[in-house]
């Protein structure tokens, strides 16, 4: 059972200012101004190709890996522009973690999947690593299912378990924000329900931004929702307001299924 959503804090953790993104000559994002509240779940919805996943990847500079990208404007995280020349990108990606659409566990044991990140960031003590692995798996609601087989290959897990493992792997490096790009689209309804419940529980300690094509999912788990269309935010407000009292005609048409 998914517990009732709590009201998020009013503290802004990420803010974008006139954010534009170009793929060579194509403008994929157009003047995105948005505030993300701390300890909130923000859903990004919209039709395929609207820019929501592109926007998500600007928040921890994953788009830097794509050739031909040009970005204008600011992304302010905890008071600093992440696109400034002296910003530590590795530290950024530790603080703003990412969970992808398809579960992507490393080809190694469950234990090594979780301990890999902390080791990279300097944790070598075995007792400390054991503690991180256990706590990360508990936070991702996977510990009881895998505690007796930590040294088996992670690929032996089911799809839903693999996705929770990927979430645990992200938690192990102590992020503040977790970006999720359609994390349940490849999962069955039971596994999807477990991930949704997990996301709501994680909000107590983390800020979550999730891209989803599933509007029912956005309604179930998110505090705020932004509707993207043609690289712009058409409307952004509390989830209840956007779904039940949309101000924009295009928003109403999209959520009523007139296009998608």
From Swiss-Prot:
All residue ranges annotated as the ABC transporter domain in the record: 14-255
Compartment(s): Cell inner membrane
Keywords: ATP-binding, Cell inner membrane, Cell membrane, Membrane, Nucleotide-binding, Phosphate transport, Translocase, Transport
GO molecular function: ATP binding; ATP hydrolysis activity; ATPase-coupled phosphate ion transmembrane transporter activity
Gene3D superfamilies: P-loop containing nucleotide triphosphate hydrolases
Gene Ontology terms: cellular component: plasma membrane
Top-tier EC class: translocase
SUPFAM superfamilies: P-loop containing nucleoside triphosphate hydrolases (SSF52540)
Keyword Acetylation: no
CDD domains from the UniProt entry: ABC_PstB_phosphate_transporter
Annotated binding of ATP, by residue: 46-53
Annotated EC: 7.3.2.1
Lineage top rank: taxon: Bacteria
Topology relative to the membrane: Peripheral membrane protein
Pfam families given in the database record: ABC_tran
GO BP: phosphate ion transmembrane transport
Catalytic activity: phosphate(out) + ATP + H2O = ADP + 2 phosphate(in) + H(+)
Entry's family note: Belongs to the ABC transporter superfamily. Phosphate importer (TC 3.A.1.7) family.
Function summary: Part of the ABC transporter complex PstSACB involved in phosphate import. Responsible for energy coupling to the transport system.
Quaternary data: The complex is composed of two ATP-binding proteins (PstB), two transmembrane proteins (PstC and PstA) and a solute-binding protein (PstS).
Designated name of the protein: Phosphate import ATP-binding protein PstB
Gene: pstB
């Amino acid at each position: 059972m998914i517990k009732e959503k709590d009201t998020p804090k009013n503290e802004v953790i990420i803010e974008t200012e006139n954010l534009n993104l170009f793929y060579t000559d194509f403008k994929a994002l157009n003047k995105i101004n948005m505030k993300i509240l701390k300890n909130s779940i923000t859903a990004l919805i919209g039709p395929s190709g609207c820019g929501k996943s592109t926007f998500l990847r600007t928040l921890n500079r994953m788009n830097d890996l794509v050739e031909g990208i040009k970005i204008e404007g600011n992304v302010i995280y905890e008071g600093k522009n992440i696109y400034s020349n002296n910003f530590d990108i590795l530290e950024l990606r530790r603080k703003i973690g990412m969970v992808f659409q398809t579960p992507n566990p490393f080809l190694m044991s469950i234990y090594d999947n979780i301990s890999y990140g902390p080791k990279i960031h300097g944790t070598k003590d075995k007792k400390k690593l054991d503690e991180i692995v256990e706590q990360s798996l508990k936070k991702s609601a996977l510990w009881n299912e895998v505690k007796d087989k930590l040294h088996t290959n992670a690929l032996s897990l089911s799809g839903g378990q693999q996705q929770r493992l990927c979430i645990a792997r992200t938690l192990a490096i102590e992020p503040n924000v977790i970006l999720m790009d359609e994390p349940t689209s490849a999962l069955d309804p039971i596994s999807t329900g477990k991930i949704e419940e997990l996301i709501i529980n994680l909000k107590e300690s983390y800020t979550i931004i999730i891209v989803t094509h599933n509007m029912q999912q956005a309604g179930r788990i998110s505090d705020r929702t932004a509707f993207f269309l043609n690289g712009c935010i058409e409307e952004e407000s509390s989830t209840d307001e956007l779904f039940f009292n949309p101000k924009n005609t295009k928003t109403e048409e999209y959520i009523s299924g007139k296009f998608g």
